[in-house]
Every structure is written in C-alpha cells, then in structure tokens.
A protein has these predicted regions:
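Short, contiguous pre-domain boundary segments
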Residues: 2-7, 22
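Long, structured ligand/cofactor-binding scaffold of large enzymes
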Residues: 11-13, 18, 22-156
Length: 156
C-alpha cells in the first residue's frame, strides 16, 4: 500500500499555506470571510491572480488531499483514468467501507460484502496501486477517522 502522510507536521505546513492565501484574499476583498470562504479561498492555486467575482469566477483550487469511498470512488477513479495521468498529483486514498450493509453481524456482513462487491474492490485496489493512491480494505473499521485526529485549523 502507498504511504499517505497524515501527521501534525504535514497539517501544520498546509495551515501555513492556507493562512498565507487567506491573507492575500482578505487584502484583496476587504471584507470579513465566511467559513465557506475560508475553506475554499484558502485552497486557491494563485490567490494573487485569481478572479474573485461571486457568481462569475471559476476558482483554480489546490486541494490538500482527495478521499474516495467505494461507492462514488469508482466513477471518480474512472474519470481520473480518462486524464491519462500516470499518478495522482495530491495525496489520494480510497476507503472501502460504504458497500458493507448491516444485515446480521459484523463478520457475516463483511464476508457478504466481500463476495457481492468483489469486482468493485478488485478494481479500486488495482487502480490505487497503479496510480499511487492509498487503499483501505473493506473492514478496516472507520477508515476515515484519521482525518480528524490532526490539530484543528483556526482561521482568525
């Protein structure tokens, strides 16, 4: 499996970039920012040059990471494959936990999902290996919990 960094140091570096971007945006807009503004505009690719006209501008964003889950991740990965890129450009992980249906008990439900969704899991596992994504197998508990263990960002 590809190692995807998810550490406090990594988060701290991302927060520095986000604060720098927001300082530029605040200077340009001269208005208070909403939480949505902070999340989106903090991820601008080039905040100095980005057109910022509400309802009109298309934003060029640079996400910190991409997280796919097994249900919608299939179409997302197929779209990525159409780009003809050899590897993902940002840390990307695929989490196979949404196709497991609660019917009887954990072990039986996991076995049923492994059988019913084998083709999906095999495709996502193969695509993750080919394109440099992290892959969380079905049954890896609440595989997305790690996202919230990082020090929270405080946008002033």
């Amino acid at each position: 499996m590809v190692a995807i960094e998810s550490t406090p140091d990594m988060a701290a570096k991302l927060y520095v970039t986000m604060r720098q971007n927001l300082a530029v945006v605040r200077r340009r807009l001269q208005k208070p920012l909403t939480l949505a503004d902070k999340v989106l505009l903090g991820h601008l690719d080039a905040p100095e040059a980005q057109e910022l006209e509400p309802g009109r501008s298309y934003l060029a964003l640079r996400p910190d990471r991409v997280v796919f889950q097994d249900v919608l991740g299939q179409s997302g990965m197929l779209q990525f494959m159409q780009t003809k890129r050899e590897r993902v450009a940002v840390p990307t992980t695929i989490h196979c936990d949404h196709l497991i249906q609660a019917r009887t008990n954990g072990e039986a439900d996991l076995r049923a999902s492994l059988d019913e969704s084998k083709e999906v899991y095999d495709f996502l596992r193969s695509a993750a290996a080919k394109y440099g994504c992290g892959f969380w197998e079905p049954g890896a508990e609440s595989s997305i919990r790690w996202c919230w263990k990082i020090t929270p960002f405080r946008a002033n």
